[in-house]
From Swiss-Prot:
Gene: Slc9c1
Keyword Transmembrane (UniProt): yes
GO biological process: cell differentiation; flagellated sperm motility; spermatogenesis
Positions of the UniProt region annotated as Ion transport-like: 618-698
Name used for this protein in its record: Solute carrier family 9 member C1
Positions in the Extracellular compartment: 1-39, 83-98, 152-157, 213-225, 284-286, 340-344, 412-415, 654-657, 717-724
CDD domains noted in UniProt: CAP_ED
Gene3D superfamilies documented for this protein: Jelly Rolls, Voltage-gated potassium channels. Chain C
Region named Disordered: 1137-1175
Membrane-spanning segments: 40-59, 65-82, 99-115, 126-151, 158-183, 187-212, 226-257, 262-283, 287-300, 308-339, 345-374, 381-411, 416-446, 633-653, 658-684, 692-716, 725-751
Pfam assignment, any one: Ion_trans
Lineage: Eukaryota, Metazoa, Chordata, Craniata, Vertebrata
Record keywords: Antiport, Cell membrane, Cell projection, Cilium, Developmental protein, Differentiation, Flagellum, Ion transport, Membrane, Sodium, Sodium transport, Spermatogenesis, Transmembrane, Transmembrane helix, Transport
Family: Belongs to the monovalent cation:proton antiporter 1 (CPA1) transporter (TC 2.A.36) family.
C-alpha cells in the first residue's frame, strides 16, 4: 500500500510539474511583454503628437518638417549619453532590427503613393516614363557607380558600391509629390514627375534587394553570374508584376460585394497588403514591386462607393505616421559618436555627392530630351530642369542606407558603417533643404506656373460670386423671426472673406482684346484661345465630376467610369481638342475577336439534326444514312479521336517513339482504317451534300494525308527512325489537327460563354454612352459657371448640344439592336437608385431621432443584402411586349379599369424606317407609346424657353434641344392631346418603330365618361417631369435624388386663370414651377414662359394665356406643424392652394379664427404630450 501511495504521489507531482512547464511556456510565448513596452508606447505617441503639431503650424517654415524631425531624433540620441533616464527611452528604439524597420514602414508608403497616382495620365505618359525610368535610370545608375568608385573615399568593395549607388539614386515619391503640389505646374508635368519618382524608388529598391539576393546565392549555388542576374530579374520583376496583376483582380472581385465603410473589411484588406508583401519576400519575389503594381492598377473606382474614401484616409494616416517614424528614428539610429568624428571633409563629400547627383541627372535628361520631346505632351529643357530639382530623397534612401550600414556585408570597421549611414542621410537632408528653396524660384523664373491671366481673373470672379451668394443667403435669414434679435453687423463682418485672388482696379477693368484679321476691329471680352482653353478644362473637370458622381450613385459600373474618366483626362492637356462621342466610341468599341470566333464556330461545326438530308431509296444507302446519323456513331468517332491522341503524342517524343515504333505503326493503321470507313459511310449517307460541308472536307483531307503517309512509309520514301525531317513534321502536325473535332462537343458551351461575354461588352458600351449623355446634361445645368464670357458660353452650348444629340442617336441604335440589354441595364439602375434612396431615408430618420441607431443598422443590413442580390440578377431581361404596354404607362399602371378601357380601341401601329409619324403643325391624333425602335423629334427652328421675358430679367435662357431622340418606353403627344394644340415638332422614324397608339377621341371619351381622374394623372406626370428637371438645377448634386423625391411627394397641379391674380408662395410652399403656358409677375411685371421655376420673391402671378398650369410643391406636414406650434410666434393661418379649393386671399382671414385655430392646435399638442407621458 505504501509503495502504491508513493508511486501515486510521484505520478501526481510529475504531472503537476509538466502542467507547470506548459503554463510557463504559454506565458512566455503569449503573455510575455518586453520590459520597455511602456517606453515604446510613450515615444510613439510623443512622435505622432509632435509631428502632427509641427505639420499644422510649420507648413511655411523654411526648414522642411523631415529635417526638423531628424534633428529632434539626433538631439534625443546625443542627450541619451548625458542622462540615464533618456538612455532608457533611446534603447527602446535602437533594439529594432533594420529589416523590421524596412518591413513596417516602407510597404504602406509605397502602396499609398501608387494608389494615389492618376492612372489615366500615367497611361497617357507611359512611353515618356518608360524612357526615363529604364534607359535613363540605367545610365544614371552607371554614372553614379563610376563616380563613387573614381573618388573611392570610403574604400569599399564592388558589392557595397553597387548597394550605395542604389541608395543615392532612389527618391521619395511621397515627398516629391508634396513638393510640387502647390507650385501650379501643368497636369502632364506633375504626373510625369510623380510617375518617374515612384518607378525610380521601386527600381532602386528592386536593385538593392536583387544585388543582396545574387550575393547570397553565389555562396550556396554554383551558377554563372549571367544566370543569377537573369533569374533574379525574372523573379523580382516579371513574376512580381504578374503576381501584382493577379492579386489586383482578386481584390477587385472581393471588394465588388462590399458596400459602405465596413471597418472589418477595411482592416482585412490592410492586413492582406502586408501579407502579400511578406509572402512575396518569402518566395523570392519583390514585395515592394508587387505592392506598387497593385496600387497602380487599383484606383478609387475599383471599390464600391463609400469604401474608397475611408480607405484613402486610412492609408494616408498610416503613411503619415510611417513618415514621422522614419525621420525621427533615423536620428536615433545614427550612433552619437559618429558626430564626434565628423570632419570638414565628410561634409564636403556629402555636398559633393549632392551636386554630382544633380549634374548627372540633368545630363541624363538633356541626353534623352530629343526622344522625350518627340513623344509629345510638350516636353522641353524647362521640364527637364524642373524634374531635376523636384526630386526629393527620403524614406527609401534612409531605409536602404540603414540596411546597408547594419547588414552582414563586409564594410570594414564600425566607423565605415557609420559613415555610410551618415552620408546616405546627409544627402537626403541637403536635398530637402536646398530643393525647397530652389524649386519654387525655378518654376517662377522658367514661367511654368499654369496660372494665366484669364484663369486668374476667372478664379477671382468665381470667388466674388461665391461671396455674393453667401451675403444673399444672410439677407434672406434676416427675415427669419427666430433670428430677429441677432447682431447682424457681427454676422456680416464674420462672413466677409479675404479674396486670395484679389487684383488691382486696372486688372479688373482690363479686357483682353483681339483684332479681327478681316476688318481690324477689336473684339471685346475674352473670346480668345486662352479663354477657350480655360473653358475646355472646366468642362472636362465638370464631366469627370459627373461621371464620378454617377458611379457613387451606382448608375455607372466600375469599368464604364474608368473609361469615361480616362477619356476625359486624356484631353485635359491637349489644346484645341475636346471630348466627343467619336472619342468615346474609340474607347468603348467592342472586341471583334469574339464575333469572329462565334462565326467560326457556327460555320465549322454543322448541326446534325439540320443536315440529315433525304434518305436514299436504296437499302444499302438508306442503312448507311441511319447509321451515320445516330448518336452512337458520332460519339464513337469522338472516342476514337481521343484514343488516337496518345500515339500521336508519343511520335513527338524521340525516346518513347523508338521503344514503341511497331505499336505506333499498328495503331496508326487501325485508326486510319476507321477514318476511311467513317468517310465512306458519310459519303454514302449524304452523297452530294457531303461536299458542301467545310468541316467534312477538312476531315477528308486529313484522312487522305494519312493515306499518303502510309504510302510513303511503305515505299521507304521517308523514315521515322532518324531525326524529324520537314515532311515528318508536316505529317504529324496534320494528324494533330484532327483533335479540333473535339470542339464539336464543347461548342454549345463555348457559344454560351461567348454570347455572355458579348452581352457584357454591349452592356459596357451602353453604360458608357448613357453615362456620357448624363454628363452632358449635368454640364448644361452649370454652364454659366463654366463659361467665362457670353461668347464662350454660346460656343460651349452648341458643342454640348451637338455632342449630346450624337450620343443619343448612338444610344438609340444600340437600344434598338439590343433591347434586352437596355431593359436589363435600366432595371438594375433603378433598383440601385431606389435602394440608395432607402438608405438615405434611414439616414434621415436616424438624424431626426425617429429610429434608433441599432434599428437603423439592422435596416441597413437588409438594404445591403438586397444590393448584393442585384449583383446576381439575371444577365438578360426581356423587354415588355404589346400586351404589357398599357401597364407601363404611368397614368394607367395602377388603374385596371382605365387599362381595360384604353385597350378597347388602342392598336399597334408599325412605321418603317424614314417614315414620319406626324409633322410639325399637324393636329394631334392621339398618343404614341414606343414599343421598340427610335424616333427623332425635330423642330423647324430653335425654340427658346422664354420668348417674352423682359430685358432686366436675370433668368438663365438656354435653348431647348433642336433635335431629340426618343427610345422604347417613351410617350409622344401627351401634352398636345391635353391642350389640343398643333404639334410643335416632327417625329421621324430612324429605325423600324412599333408603337401602341391611343386615339384622341377615345382618350377624351375616357376623360368625360369612364376615367375622369386620368386627365389629372396625365398632367401630374408631365408636371413632375418638368418640376424634377427645374428643381434639380437648384439642388446639390450629391443628394438630389432623395431631396427631390421628398419634395415631389407633396406636389399638386393648379390652373392659373387669365382674368384674375393668384397668390402662390406662402410658408407652406417651397417651389412653384410653371409647366405650361405663360404668366406675369404682378409686382415686378416680368413675364415667365414654361417651363420655368418661379422665384420665391414672386407672390402673385396672372395667366397670360388661356391655358396656364403650375406645379406647387409644399412642405411636409411635420414641418408645417412645427412652424405653427411655436407659441411665441403664432403666424396667421393661411389656406394652401389645393387643386379644388376656392380662391381665398391670405389677408382676409379673421383674427378670431386664427386664435381659435392656435388654441385648438395647442390643446391637441397638450393632449398628445399627456398620452406620451401616460405611455
Amino acid at each position: 500500500m505504501e509503495m502504491e501511495e508513493i508511486s501515486e504521489n510521484l505520478t501526481a507531482s510529475h504531472s503537476i510539474k509538466l502542467t507547470n512547464m506548459w503554463l510557463e511556456l504559454l506565458k512566455s510565448v503569449f503573455l510575455s511583454t518586453p520590459q520597455d513596452l511602456p517606453e515604446i508606447i510613450l515615444i510613439l505617441s510623443l512622435i505622432c503628437t509632435v509631428g502632427a503639431f509641427l505639420n499644422m503650424h510649420l507648413k511655411d517654415f523654411p526648414i522642411p518638417l523631415p529635417v526638423i524631425l531628424f534633428l529632434i531624433g539626433c538631439c534625443f540620441e546625443i542627450l541619451s549619453f548625458a542622462s540615464t533616464q533618456i538612455q532608457i527611452y533611446a534603447d527602446a528604439i535602437q533594439w529594432m532590427d533594420p529589416d523590421i524597420f524596412f518591413g513596417i514602414f516602407t510597404p504602406v508608403i509605397i502602396f499609398n503613393v501608387a494608389f494615389d497616382m492618376d492612372i489615366y495620365m500615367l497611361q497617357k505618359l507611359f512611353w515618356q516614363i518608360l524612357v526615363i525610368t529604364i534607359p535613363g535610370f540605367l545610365i544614371n545608375y552607371t554614372l553614379i557607380l563610376w563616380y563613387l568608385q573614381s573618388v573611392n573615399k570610403l574604400s569599399l568593395k564592388t558589392v557595397p558600391w553597387l548597394l550605395f549607388s542604389a541608395v543615392l539614386i532612389s527618391s521619395d515619391p511621397m515627398l516629391t509629390s508634396a513638393s510640387i503640389r502647390d507650385l501650379g505646374l501643368s497636369r502632364s508635368l506633375t504626373n510625369l514627375i510623380n510617375g518617374e519618382s515612384l518607378l525610380t524608388s521601386v527600381l532602386s529598391l528592386v536593385i538593392y534587394s536583387g544585388v543582396v539576393h545574387i550575393r547570397f546565392k553565389s555562396k550556396s549555388v554554383n551558377h554563372t553570374l549571367a544566370h543569377k542576374v537573369m533569374s533574379t530579374a525574372w523573379s523580382y520583376i516579371v513574376e512580381s508584376f504578374i503576381t501584382g496583376i493577379v492579386f489586383t483582380k482578386v481584390i477587385q472581385l472581393w471588394m465588388a460585394t462590399i458596400f459602405g465603410d465596413d471597418v472589418n473589411h477595411i482592416t482585412l484588406i490592410f492586413s492582406v497588403l502586408y501579407l502579400i508583401f511578406y509572402v512575396c519576400e518569402l518566395v523570392g519575389m519583390s514585395g515592394i514591386f508587387t505592392l506598387a503594381t497593385i496600387g497602380l492598377f487599383l484606383n478609387s473606382t475599383s471599390f464600391k462607393p463609400g469604401v474608397e474614401a475611408f480607405l484613402l484616409e486610412f492609408w494616408n494616416c498610416l503613411s503619415f505616421i510611417g513618415f514621422l517614424m522614419v525621420f525621427t528614428f533615423i536620428g536615433l539610429l545614427i550612433p552619437a559618436h559618429t558626430y564626434l568624428h565628423i570632419s570638414f571633409s565628410d561634409v564636403y563629400y556629402s555636398l559633393n555627392i549632392y551636386f554630382t547627383l544633380i549634374v548627372l541627372r540633368l545630363l541624363v535628361f538633356l541626353l534623352m530630351s530629343p526622344i522625350l520631346s518627340r513623344l509629345g505632351h510638350g516636353f522641353s529643357w524647362r521640364w527637364a530642369f524642373i524634374m531635376v530639382w523636384s526630386e526629393m530623397k527620403g524614406t527609401p534612401n534612409i531605409n536602404m542606407a540603414l540596411l546597408l550600414a547594419y547588414s552582414d556585408i563586409s564594410l570594414g570597421s564600425e566607423r565605415e558603417r557609420s559613415q555610410i549611414l551618415f552620408h546616405g542621410v546627409s544627402v537626403c537632408v541637403i536635398t530637402l533643404i536646398v530643393n525647397r528653396f530652389i524649386l519654387p524660384m525655378a518654376v517662377t523664373k522658367l514661367g511654368l506656373r499654369d496660372v494665366t491671366s484669364t484663369k486668374y481673373k476667372s478664379v477671382y470672379y468665381t470667388f466674388q460670386h461665391f461671396q455674393e451668394l453667401t451675403k444673399s443667403t444672410a439677407m434672406a435669414l434676416k427675415f427669419d423671426k427666430d433670428l430677429a434679435n441677432a447682431d447682424w453687423n457681427m454676422v456680416d463682418n464674420a462672413i466677409i472673406l479675404q479674396n486670395p485672388y484679389a487684383m488691382n482696379q486696372e486688372e479688373i477693368t482690363e479686357h483682353q482684346k483681339v483684332k479681327c484679321p478681316d476688318c481690324n476691329k477689336e473684339i471685346d471680352e475674352t473670346l480668345n484661345i486662352e479663354a477657350m482653353e480655360l473653358t475646355n478644362r472646366r468642362l472636362l473637370s465638370a464631366q469627370i465630376a459627373s461621371y464620378q458622381r454617377q458611379y457613387r450613385n451606382e448608375v455607372l459600373s466600375q469599368s464604364a467610369v474608368q473609361v469615361l474618366v480616362g477619356a476625359a483626362g486624356s484631353f485635359g492637356e491637349k489644346k484645341g481638342e475636346y471630348m466627343s462621342p467619336e472619342n468615346i466610341k474609340n474607347f468603348s468599341e467592342s472586341k471583334k475577336l469574339l464575333s469572329f470566333l462565334r462565326k467560326l464556330l457556327l460555320n465549322w461545326v454543322y448541326n446534325t439534326k439540320k443536315d440529315k438530308g433525304v434518305p436514299s431509296r436504296y437499302m444499302f444507302l438508306h442503312a448507311c444514312h441511319r447509321i451515320v446519323f445516330t448518336n452512337e456513331f458520332e460519339y464513337t468517332g469522338y472516342l476514337v479521336v481521343l484514343m488516337s491522341t496518345y500515339p500521336m503524342i508519343i511520335c513527338w517524343i524521340s525516346r518513347l517513339k523508338d521503344i514503341y515504333d511497331n505499336e505506333i505503326k499498328c495503331a496508326n493503321y487501325y485508326f486510319l482504317a476507321f477514318y476511311i470507313l467513317e468517310a465512306l459511310l458519310k459519303v454514302a449517307a449524304m452523297r452530294k451534300e457531303f461536299f458542301s460541308h467545310t468541316w467534312l472536307l477538312f476531315e477528308l483531307g486529313i484522312t487522305l494525308v494519312g493515306v499518303l503517309d502510309i504510302i510513303l512509309i511503305e515505299t521507304d520514301s521517308i523514315s521515322y527512325n532518324f531525326d524529324l525531317t520537314e515532311t515528318v513534321v508536316f505529317m504529324n502536325v496534320i494528324r494533330l489537327l484532327r483533335i479540333l473535332r473535339i470542339l464539336k462537343l464543347v461548342t454549345p458551351k463555348l457559344l454560351q460563354i461567348i454570347d455572355k461575354r458579348m452581352s457584357q461588352q454591349i452592356s459596357f458600351r451602353y453604360s458608357i454612352l448613357k453615362g456620357y449623355v448624363q454628363g452632358e446634361m449635368d454640364v448644361l445645368n452649370i454652364i454659366d459657371q463654366i463659361a467665362s464670357s457670353k461668347q464662350t458660353k454660346q460656343i460651349l452650348l452648341k458643342r454640348v448640344m451637338r455632342n449630346m444629340e450624337h450620343a443619343m442617336k448612338e444610344l438609340g441604335y444600340l437600344e434598338y439592336d439590343h433591347p434586352e440589354i437596355a431593359v436589363t441595364m435600366k432595371t438594375k439602375e433603378e433598383i440601385n437608385v431606389m435602394l440608395n434612396m432607402a438608405r438615405e431615408i434611414v439616414k434621415a430618420f436616424r438624424s431626426k431621432g425617429i429610429i434608433h441607431k441599432v434599428e437603423g443598422t439592422e435596416i441597413n443590413k437588409l438594404i445591403m443584402a438586397k444590393k448584393i442580390q442585384v449583383l446576381d440578377l439575371q444577365s438578360v431581361i426581356q423587354p415588355f411586349n404589346v400586351e404589357e404596354a398599357p401597364c407601363n404607362i404611368p397614368w394607367l399602371s395602377e388603374d385596371p379599369e382605365a387599362i381595360t378601357f384604353i385597350q378597347e380601341k388602342a392598336k399597334v401601329v408599325t412605321f418603317d424606317c424614314g417614315n414620319n409619324i406626324f409633322e410639325e403643325g399637324d393636329e394631334p391624333e392621339g398618343i404614341y407609346v414606343i414599343i421598340s425602335g427610335m424616333v427623332k423629334l425635330k423642330r423647324s427652328k430653335p425654340h427658346l424657353e422664354m420668348e417674352r421675358v423682359s430685358a432686366e430679367s436675370e433668368i438663365k435662357i438656354h435653348p431647348l434641344p433642336h433635335t431629340e431622340y426618343l427610345l422604347s418606353g417613351e410617350i409622344i403627344g401627351e401634352l398636345n392631346c391635353l391642350t389640343k394644340e398643333r404639334m410643335q415638332y416632327s417625329a421621324t422614324c430612324k429605325t423600324v418603330v412599333e408603337t401602341y397608339f391611343i386615339p384622341i377621341s377615345h382618350l377624351y371619351e375616357g376623360f368625360e365618361k369612364r376615367c375622369p381622374n386620368m386627365k389629372h394623372k396625365m398632367w401630374q406626370k408631365i408636371g413632375l417631369a418638368i418640376t424634377a428637371q427645374k428643381i434639380r438645377e437648384h439642388l446639390s448634386f450629391e443628394d438630389w435624388n432623395y431631396k427631390l423625391q421628398l419634395k415631389l411627394c407633396n406636389a399638386f397641379i393648379r390652373d392659373i386663370p387669365k382674368s384674375m391674380k393668384t397668390d402662390i408662395y406662402d410658408e407652406t410652399v417651397t417651389h412653384v414651377v410653371l409647366i405650361h403656358g405663360s404668366a406675369e409677375d404682378c409686382q415686378l411685371r416680368k413675364i415667365y414662359k414654361a417651363p420655368f421655376l418661379i422665384p420665391v420673391t414672386c407672390h402673385q402671378i396672372q395667366g397670360m394665356e388661356d391655358f396656364t398650369k403650375v406645379m406647387i410643391i409644399q412642405t411636409s406636414i411635420a414641418v408645417r406643424k412645427f412652424r405653427w406650434n411655436v407659441r411665441k410666434y403664432i403666424p396667421p393661418r393661411r389656406i394652401s392652394m389645393k387643386p379644388d379649393s376656392e380662391r381665398e386671399s391670405f389677408e382676409t382671414l379673421d383674427e378670431t379664427s386664427e386664435e381659435d385655430n392656435g388654441k385648438k392646435e395647442n390643446q391637441e399638442n397638450e393632449e398628445l404630450i399627456e398620452e406620451n407621458i401616460n405611455i
